[in-house]
Each structure stands twice: as structure tokens, then as C-alpha cells.
């Protein structure tokens, strides 16, 4: 297959459909209404992701990463994830997970699917138990730097990157990547992307990745 050698996937709204990591965790903790309002304000550019993190971090104090993973496993994940990642990995494509949500969620997917690197907002933990204290904030600009830094260290240019995402946190990366797919995306992400795709099966990105690379 003729593919971009680096493909970056977003998490919330892209791989996790119809909800977010924060909303799933909030439902578990009985805080759904509060997080829904935070996410509305974030997508309206009224607040930054650090406000979301600071407000919700304390609710997770004393909860184990294993508990959180079990909650996330029951989420509505897009069809075709395993098959898509397997095809890309078999074509020697480096897979990155670029997200601004909690990094423990990204680590769950790295363990399951073998992403070369993942990003996210970090929380202190001891012996697998979350502290409720944010140790590193992460926003859409950090997400771009995460990809830029990984590419620089691994010998790739940003023109060799295909980015797949759905919303505000993907826009800076879309502007820098060689190819970008707005997948089931918001209008701002669609406007920033080189390609727009609506589908409930991730395998549909494969043909688009191949055809786009062939005309580069």
C-alpha cells in the first residue's frame, strides 16, 4: 500500500464515538452535567482544556487506573479499529495517538493496539491509583508539538504525516500535516482538513490514505 509513513489518530469523537473520555468518567462518578457544560464551553472557545482538567481532576482522586480503564472499555468505539491499525502497521506505518484528554485513556489504547507514542493531559498516580492532581496540562497546541517533536526525533517531516480527527483540538495539527481527514467532524475541523469523511467504520480511511498519497 502507498501510505503516509506516519498516521496520527485523535481519540475523543474520532475513535470514541458519541461521547468522550471525560463524559464516560463523569457518568461513572455522577458528574455528567458538570462535564457536559465544560465540554460545551471548550468547544465554543470559552475556556481552555486546562480549565476542564482542573475542574474534573479532583473527582478522580483515589480511583484506580484499572477502574477507569474498565469504564472506558464499555464506551462506544468506532468499528474497524483493530483491522485498520493492523493494516497500517503491516504497511510499516508509524501510529501515533494524539489526544488532549487524560493520558491514562491514551495509555489504555497504546497497550491494546501498539501505538508508537501517545499524548494527553497527565495526572499523578501512585501504585496505579490516581491522585486527582494534574501534573501536565495538554491542549491543541501541545498536541501539534507532540507530533512535531516525535517526527523530528524519528526522522520524518510533517509533510509525511496524515492526521485524523474531528474537532477543535485537531485544527492546529491539520494545518501542519501533509494530509488531514476530518472524520465525522465539526465544521471548524472540516474547514481545516484536506479531506472530509463521514463513516462509522474506521477502515474507510484506508482507501483515502492510499489514494491521497498516490497523488502527492
Where are these regions (language model features)?
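Active-site neighborhood of HAD-like aspartate-dependent phosphohydrolases
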Residues: 1-50, 54
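Metal-dependent phosphoesterase signature
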Residues: 50-83
Amino acid at each position: 500500500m502507498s501510505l503516509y509513513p506516519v498516521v496520527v489518530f485523535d481519540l475523543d469523537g474520532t475513535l470514541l464515538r458519541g461521547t468522550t473520555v471525560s463524559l464516560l468518567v463523569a457518568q461513572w462518578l455522577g458528574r455528567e452535567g458538570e462535564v457536559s457544560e465544560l465540554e460545551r464551553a471548550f468547544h465554543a472557545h470559552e475556556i481552555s482544556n486546562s480549565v476542564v482538567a482542573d475542574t474534573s481532576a479532583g473527582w478522580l482522586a483515589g480511583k484506580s487506573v484499572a477502574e477507569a480503564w474498565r469504564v472506558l472499555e464499555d464506551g462506544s468505539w468506532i468499528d474497524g479499529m483493530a483491522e485498520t491499525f493492523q493494516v497500517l502497521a503491516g504497511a510499516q506505518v508509524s501510529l501515533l495517538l494524539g489526544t488532549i484528554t487524560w493520558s491514562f485513556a491514551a495509555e489504555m489504547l497504546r497497550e491494546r493496539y501498539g501505538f508508537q507514542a501517545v499524548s494527553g493531559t497527565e495526572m499523578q498516580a501512585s501504585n496505579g491509583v490516581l491522585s486527582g492532581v494534574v501534573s501536565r496540562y495538554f491542549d491543541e497546541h501541545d498536541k501539534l508539538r507532540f507530533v512535531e517533536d516525535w517526527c523530528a526525533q524519528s526522522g520524518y517531516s510533517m509533510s509525511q504525516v496524515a492526521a485524523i480527527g474531528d474537532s477543535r483540538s485537531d485544527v492546529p495539527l491539520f494545518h501542519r500535516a501533509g494530509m488531514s481527514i476530518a472524520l465525522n467532524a465539526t465544521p471548524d475541523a472540516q474547514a481545516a482538513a484536506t479531506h472530509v469523511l463521514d463513516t462509522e467504520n474506521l477502515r474507510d480511511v484506508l482507501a483515502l490514505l492510499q489514494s491521497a498519497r498516490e497523488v502527492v
